């Protein structure tokens, strides 16, 4: 599972309740991980961290024969696509919720500003100077949930750091330029009223991807935070769609006989399919202690929930 640990906690519970083992860690500098807050020096380092961590879980005996799915929201969707690019045959599929295939023009700095910032990124990489609109206001529709997010001290709410913003921009461009290379099964979910990441680029991913098994669902009137910022009835609908998609693909032996689903155009945690969910505390060193996080170089024990 790749995304924001605070926002994805409830998502992990939903998937675990549906019978899936859910794993994740904080990105470096995010959540409870070490490092400068929300500073990304190189996006590829973040992807490498995710790759090592998730594969270490998949190599454990109890999960070795399970189907493996990526789950990514927003920036985590870009991470999921880059993990697939890094090892195209490893993952059995991905759920991509409002993926960062392209940053919306409505929150992106003016091109002239980007040019100026690029010239000083190696001099002041950690400065919080990138002008941008308030993403929390733009992402979370439900006012009560929005205020809850604002009050959480683990949620970064300053201006983006210079290097971080430029890395996100470069990554989104790279992802957008390589949409045709995506070959794994995937399910894209995107709010049509999203002003943070562009739903039209999600549609382009669906159209250009080489995947034989691909599904997209666009939700009229919904914003960026589909699983954490919408009214409860919308959140329930989104999770119902996610679990239904995973359930149809969670057995490898059945995958070969599946027919590709039709796209729902009218309307990327790693999950180990059918892993038992136990209410007991995990054994020391057991993977079951990890739930709903992001990637980072921090000790994964910090992310135990």
What is each stretch, according to the model?
Residues 4-7, 11, 31-67, 232-237:
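Catalytic nucleophile-loop/oxyanion-hole region of alpha/beta-hydrolase
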Residues 182, 188-190, 194:
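Short beta-strand/loop motif that positions the catalytic acidic residue
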Residues 160-179:
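Active-site nucleophile elbow and catalytic-triad environment of alpha/beta-hydrolase enzymes
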Residues 184, 198-207:
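Short alpha-helix in the alpha/beta-hydrolase fold that links the catalytic acid
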Residues 71-160, 164:
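Alpha/beta-hydrolase-fold enzymes
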Residues 220-305:
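Catalytic active-site module of serine/aspartate enzymes centered on a nucleophile-bearing elbow/loop
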Residues 203, 207-225:
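Catalytic histidine neighborhood in serine/cysteine hydrolases
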Residues 12-35:
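Conserved alpha/beta-hydrolase
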């Amino acid at each position: 599972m790749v995304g924001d640990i605070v926002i994805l906690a409830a998502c992990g519970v939903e998937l675990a309740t549906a019978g899936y083992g859910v794993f994740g860690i904080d990105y470096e500098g995010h959540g409870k991980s070490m490092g400068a807050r929300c500073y990304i020096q190189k996006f590829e380092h973040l992807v490498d961290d995710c790759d090592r961590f998730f594969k270490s879980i998949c190599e454990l005996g109890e999960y070795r024969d399970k189907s493996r799915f990526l789950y990514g929201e927003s920036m985590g969707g870009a991470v999921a696509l880059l993990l697939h690019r890094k090892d195209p045959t490893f993952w059995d599929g991905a759920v991509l919720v409002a993926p960062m295939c392209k940053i919306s023009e409505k929150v992106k700095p003016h091109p002239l500003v980007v040019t100026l910032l690029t010239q000083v990124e190696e001099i002041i990489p950690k400065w919080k100077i990138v002008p941008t609109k308030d993403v929390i206001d733009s992402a979370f529709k439900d006012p009560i949930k929005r205020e809850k997010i604002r009050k959480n001290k683990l949620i970064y709410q300053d201006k983006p750091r210079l290097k971080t913003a430029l890395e996100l921009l470069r990554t989104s461009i790279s992802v957008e330029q390589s949409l045709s290379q995506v070959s794994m099964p995937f399910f894209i979910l995107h709010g049509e009223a999203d002003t943070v990441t562009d739903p039209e680029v999600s549609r382009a991913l669906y159209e250009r991807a080489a995947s034989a098994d691909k599904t997209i669902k666009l939700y009229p009137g919904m914003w960026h935070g589909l699983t954490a910022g919408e009214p409860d009835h919308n959140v329930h609908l989104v999770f119902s769609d996610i679990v239904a998609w995973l359930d149809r693909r969670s057995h490898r032996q059945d995958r070969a006989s599946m027919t590709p689903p039709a796209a729902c155009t009218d309307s990327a945690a790693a999950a180990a399919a059918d892993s038992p969910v136990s209410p007991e505390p995990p054994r020391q060193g057991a993977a079951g202690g990890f739930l709903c996080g992001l990637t980072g170089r921090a000790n994964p024990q910090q992310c135990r929930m």
